[in-house]
Amino acid sequence: MKKILIIILSTFFLSQSVLAADQTIDMLNKLGKEHMVYSKKIVKIDIGDTVFWKAKTRGHNVEFIKGGVPKGVEKFRSPLNKDTEYKFEIPGIYAYWCTPHKGMGMIGFVIVGNDKSNLDDIKKIKYLGKSKKIAEELINSL
C-alpha cells in the first residue's frame, strides 16, 4: 500500500513538472538582422503559466497594448531595464510591446489556452510604425 502511494504521488509530481510550460523571452537590441526585438514574437502557453521577460540589453520593457488583451485583464507595464514576469490566468491573445520601441516593431503576442476569441480586438489595435507590418504578419500566422 505504501509503495502504491509513493508511485501515485511520484507520478503526479513528475507529470506536473512536465505540464508546466513557462516561457522565457529575451528583450534585445539585436537578433540576427533584426533590431529592437523580443527573442520570441509569439508564445503559446496554458492558463496559469508564467512568461518571464529578461532584460538582456538596456532600454526595454513590456507593456500590454490597450485593447489588446482579453476582457478582465488589468493594465501591465514593467519598468525599463528590469526583468519581469506575468502569470496568465485569463485565456486569450495578449498583445504587448516595448514602450520606447513600439514604433520600431518591438511587439509580441502571448496566446493563452489556445483561445483566440479576442482576435478581432487584436486586429483593431492602432499599431505604430514598423509594428503595423509585424502585427499583420503575426496575426496572419495565428
List where the protein language model places each region.
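Positively charged n-region of N-terminal signal peptides that target proteins for export
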Residues: 1-4
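Extracytoplasmic copper-binding redox domains, predominantly the cupredoxin/blue-copper superfamily
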Residues: 19-142
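Bacterial N-terminal signal peptides
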Residues: 7-15
